[in-house]
């Protein structure tokens, strides 16, 4: 109502000569708390800054005496100060004069006047203010709040002043609180600390946008908040992750002349480090020192943690050494940051050194220290060490948290030790640590890996009952389990359930479906899933394209496989050595060996890749199967010259190719080379040797390798056994054939059912 009167009567304001406001009008500032103000007119000889002042000026003309008179209900501006002090001091709240004052429609206008009369005694003014609030139907105007805030602040009653300001802001006034506070500033001896208090109150209440607007107005009137208050706003923005607002306000506060403190820089550096912008953090660190501020433990901890999390381990050590050189004592947080970053990037031994140094310096490792090391040992597969630290942790009286337990549970699940995983899970519940979504997901994943899908689904169902909402990782684990079990229908049901919960599938989930469908040779369905993924704005990666390409080659459709390679290049998707291995192997198996050779020769120039052992092996195998044994041998030699170690498959392919060409000596030389380097023959290698030698009429050697094979515990299949026996019969080696047949039946490698497959003699 009062702000409306001010606008209606064109109440304007001008500033005292001792205050130098900005030339721009306050009406330009838009705020949820803002009420438009008219601009000052130079032609006006007087001004009124608020409804209270306007009415009191008006009443100066009327000049009714402020006393109780029969037949009158109007009061003049001349209060009997002693009377009002006496009424308030003695709690004479039923005084007729006071009753009539609050019976008036203009009571909210008169109350500020009474407060001004009582300003010499701030406690009485505050007492009257609080009593007024108890009156039924009465509500203080913004002017009342502002006047009493000024009075209390001048009296250094800061706690009460802050309470009043907070209550005023929460009352959701329909006009700009700052403007009214400014217009009433001369009620007491001018002081601008109350504006900083308003700024702080807005921050404390989480009204950050309003705080920014308040700061802007303070800048216009050259009334600047304290650095401590600015730090409060920076800290709030940083906690909310509003990095852009942090940067913007830091620049504004410096521009307004605020002098940043160590705490200011600590907030900024920590914020930049959490965003991963470590170079910006370094710049602030150097700027801080340039201003003559000395970094403290918090500063160094932020720098060490920030650089450590992005893998800049050398920098973390440099900051750590500088910290000690500056006589800034590292604390447990410092060492925890160092242990974490070195463990995270696979340097567990160095992390352990920092752990020992921490203990050597008399610092006690906390739950975070132990949990970090337990997790690191688990990820390295060093379960005994992980359990040792877990036991030590309990021994020193520390209670493992959900992170500790979940690390151990996840590690046990990954090695298939589900009994210990569930034992730890039960222990976790017994000590009062609830399972979180990560715990459930680890156990579900473990059950799926063990193909215990029924139990996995039951545990998944218990999550909602326990008040734990499954996340994307939980669904990924269960869906992957069903896909691996080839139960695509149930996997699809879970996908729809996931979408119904508002969870968006990610690249991993789509990739799982594509892999599952491709393994079932449902390539078109996999293509549909891939198109859906693209529609959702998720770009397929190299692995997904490689999976689909492999499926096309295996289905005998090399054209589509090559089309996917072209698509990868068009979309700038990385063609990896894995992709290339699938390409070469797929072309060779589809009898497109010349095309495979062409791509192999272009691997460096066109794709920027170096062929690895797997690619060479695929090419060697393809050439051998295409009867190009000489080219395969040349490629084998090139492979060795490049420092690549041929594997068992490469040797077996080349050995098999030589046997097919009748090159028995070359084939046996390859077998001797395998023995020389300690490479044991497997089923395929032995099969190649036995089959090759028998078909080259080297029956004695074939029999020798067959017996060696059986002696090694490698059982030849019946096809090979019958093939060797038939060769004996073909060459007329009847006695040897009968003896061999008896030998094979003795080792249960032939049954009587196979007699029909052998020639009748």
Swiss-Prot record:
GO cellular component labels: mitochondrion
Keyword Repeat: yes
SUPFAM superfamilies membership: HCP-like (SSF81901)
InterPro entries, per the entry: Pentatricopeptide_rpt, PPR-containing_protein, TPR-like_helical_dom_sf
Keywords: Repeat
Any one GO biological process: mitochondrial mRNA processing
Spans of repeat PPR: 141-175, 191-225, 226-260, 261-295, 296-330, 331-365, 366-400, 401-435, 436-470, 471-505, 506-540, 541-575, 576-606, 612-646, 647-681, 682-716, 717-751
A GO molecular-function annotation: pre-mRNA binding
Stored NCBIfam families: PPR
PANTHER family (alphabetical): MEMBRANE-ASSOCIATED SALT-INDUCIBLE PROTEIN-LIKE, OS03G0201400 PROTEIN
Family under the similarity heading: Belongs to the PPR family. P subfamily.
Protein name listed in UniProt: Putative pentatricopeptide repeat-containing protein At2g02150
Natural source organism: Arabidopsis thaliana (Mouse-ear cress)
